């Protein structure tokens, strides 16, 4: 499970990530009653860039386990971030939503790593401008702690406590050519 390469430690291998995504899919199936009569339509919205392929993989697992097709979209939060002044030249990513919008839907935001909570706050602001879903939940592959806002995930693949001087990187095969979760050690912040 854990492979050390200098200052980089592989915390989750490709197989570990696949098992973790399957576990998240099972949690969503259990908590949402996807195909029960009268349930709100579920929509997985990945936050670019890491959350989008993870949302797709979760949807694939849900279909494999239940036969239910859960739609997947993406939600760009760039213009809603509170740190735009620090890095004003960010590339905008596409936002892809169902044609019928998000009103009345059960939205599950999907991201790769939950850290300060600021990205999720930006996602909530973006959703507010787009429509009014009935339920908004959060699924993350990794929760590394250090929240700056009162935000928690409803579905957590792996809790990986870190120091503030460390970084957790999620590599996804479709983007990076390999799948792994890696801890990079840095200097401890004062």
Swiss-Prot record:
SUPFAM superfamilies for the chain: PRTase-like
EC number in record: 2.4.2.9
Keywords: Glycosyltransferase, Transcription, Transcription regulation, Transferase
Motif mapping: PRPP-binding: 107-119
Enzyme class of the recorded protein, top EC level: transferase
Catalysis performed (reactions): UMP + diphosphate = 5-phospho-alpha-D-ribose 1-diphosphate + uracil
Any one of the GO BP annotations: regulation of DNA-templated transcription
Domain of life from the UniProt record: Bacteria
Keyword Transferase included in the entry's annotation: yes
Pfam families associated with the record: Pribosyltran (PF00156)
GO terms for MF: uracil phosphoribosyltransferase activity
Keyword Transferase attached: yes
Function: Regulates the transcription of the pyrimidine nucleotide (pyr) operon in response to exogenous pyrimidines.
Family per record: Belongs to the purine/pyrimidine phosphoribosyltransferase family. PyrR subfamily.
Protein name in UniProt: Bifunctional protein PyrR
């Amino acid at each position: 499970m854990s492979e050390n390469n200098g200052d980089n430690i592989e915390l989750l291998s490709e197989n570990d990530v696949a098992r973790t995504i399957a576990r998240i899919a099972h949690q969503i199936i259990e908590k949402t009653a996807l195909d029960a009569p009268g349930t709100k339509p579920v929509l997985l919205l990945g936050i670019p860039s890491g959350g989008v392929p993870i949302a797709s993989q979760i949807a694939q697992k849900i279909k494999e386990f239940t036969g239910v097709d859960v739609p997947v979209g993406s939600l760009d939060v760039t213009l809603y971030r509170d740190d735009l002044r620090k890095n004003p030249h960010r590339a905008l990513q596409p936002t892809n939503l169902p044609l019928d919008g998000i009103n009345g839907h059960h939205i599950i935001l999907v991201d790769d790593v939950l850290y300060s909570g600021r990205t999720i706050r930006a996602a909530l602001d973006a959703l507010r401008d787009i429509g009014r879903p009935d339920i908004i939940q959060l699924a993350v592959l990794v929760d590394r702690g250090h929240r700056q806002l009162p935000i928690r995930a409803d579905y957590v693949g792996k809790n990986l406590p870190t120091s503030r001087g460390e970084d957790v990187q999620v590599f996804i095969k479709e983007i990076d050519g390999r799948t792994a979760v890696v801890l990079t050690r840095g200097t401890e912040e004062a």
